Structures are given as structure tokens and as C-alpha cells.
Regions:
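Hydrophobic alpha-helical transmembrane segments of multipass integral membrane proteins
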Residues: 3-4, 8, 12, 16, ...
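Glycine-rich helix-loop "coupling/hinge" segments at transmembrane-helix boundaries
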Residues: 146-171
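Transmembrane alpha-helices
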Residues: 95-97, 113, 119-154
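Membrane-interfacial helix termini and adjacent extracytoplasmic/periplasmic loops
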Residues: 1, 48-87, 157-160
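Periplasmic/extracellular loop-to-transmembrane helix junction in inner-membrane transport proteins
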Residues: 1-7, 25, 71
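Faces of alpha-helical transmembrane segments in polytopic inner-membrane proteins
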Residues: 9-12, 36-44, 72-98, 129, ...
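Transmembrane helix boundary and interhelical loop/hinge segments in multi-pass membrane proteins
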Residues: 11-14, 24-28, 96-110, 119-121, ...
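Cytoplasmic-entry segments and transmembrane alpha-helices of multi-pass inner-membrane transporters
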Residues: 12-51, 95-96
């Protein structure tokens, strides 16, 4: 479940962090960053009930519509729990990574741009490698939170933790 959560949270959180740190205008950043940090404060039980009542049945119905018959995703499965946990962890990854990317010295960015690199090349070749140790720490912190969260899994997995190999099968 933590693996599914990390597969959801890390790419989206890193992309949001890069956007906020490098591309967003100060006005947009002043709105988006506090909103993301506010999302990090939502209790786990709220996410669990959201998974149980809304997301699980929606994924089941979507998979039934895609196959034209029986659903291949059950409402209460590892995938649903991991997806909701990933949504819950996006603000953590994003906020920590944004702070780390913002801490990269401006001189490194200016040096890269002065040598003729584009903005995206500077981010890819200079900023992210310089911020990598901190980003890895943020991902490890997020992974430990994902492993530690249990309430969302209990609710989204149908209150019976019988693990199966198939992440789309009901638990």
C-alpha cells in the first residue's frame, strides 16, 4: 500500500514543487503553498472516509464501465487505499521538496543560465542534482509516514487486512 502511495505522491509532489519553486509567479506561489500546507493538516480519518464513500465506488464503477461488465477494481482494495494515501502525502512531498529546491543558491542558477542553458535545462542539470540529497530525505520522510498511517488503510481496505497479491482485488 505504501508503494502505491509513493508511486502517486512522489512524481506529483515533485512536479508541484518544481513548478512552485521555479515557474510560479510570487502571487500564485503565495496562494498555492499555504493551500498545500493546509491539505497536509487534514486528518487521516477524513481521507479514509473519502476513500470508503467516494473514491472506492467510483473506481469500481469506472473499471466496470471500461470493461463493459464486471469491475476489475474492487471498491475496497489495496489500490484504492494506496491512491488515497498518495493523495494525502502529496502536500508533504511538495512542501518539503519546494523548500529544498528554493534553498539552492541563485548563483548556481545564474551560472547555468549565463552559460546559455535554458530554464528547463538549468532545472534538470543544476537545480535538481543540487537538491537531490534533500529530496531523497523528503521522500524517505514521506515513505515513513506512508508506512505509519493505518487508519486510511483500515477504512479503505474494508476493515479486514487480508493481503492479496492482486492490488485490485478486495481485501
Amino acid at each position: 500500500i505504501a508503494l502505491v502511495a509513493l508511486l502517486v505522491a512522489v512524481p506529483i509532489g515533485l512536479m508541484a514543487a518544481v513548478y512552485m519553486a521555479e515557474y510560479a509567479k510570487p502571487h500564485v506561489r503565495s496562494i498555492v503553498k499555504p493551500a498545500l500546507e493546509l491539505l497536509a493538516g487534514i486528518p487521516t480519518i477524513v481521507y479514509g472516509i473519502f476513500a470508503l464513500i467516494t473514491l472506492g465506488p467510483w473506481l469500481r464503477d469506472l473499471s466496470a464501465a471500461l470493461t463493459g461488465g464486471s469491475p476489475f477494481i474492487q471498491a475496497q482494495c489495496i489500490f484504492t487505499a494506496g491512491l488515497v494515501m498518495g493523495i494525502m502525502l502529496i502536500p508533504v512531498v511538495s512542501s518539503l521538496s519546494d523548500d529544498i529546491i528554493t534553498a539552492v543558491p541563485k548563483a548556481m542558477r545564474d551560472g547555468s543560465l549565463g552559460l546559455g542553458a535554458t530554464r528547463s535545462e538549468t532545472i534538470k542539470k543544476v537545480v535538481l542534482p543540487a537538491a537531490l540529497p534533500g529530496i531523497v530525505g523528503a521522500v524517505l520522510l514521506t515513505a515513513s509516514r506512508a508506512i505509519g498511517e493505518t487508519m486510511i488503510v483500515v477504512l479503505a481496505a474494508g476493515v479486514a487486512a487480508i493481503l492479496t497479491i492482486n492490488p485490485f482485488e478486495a481485501m
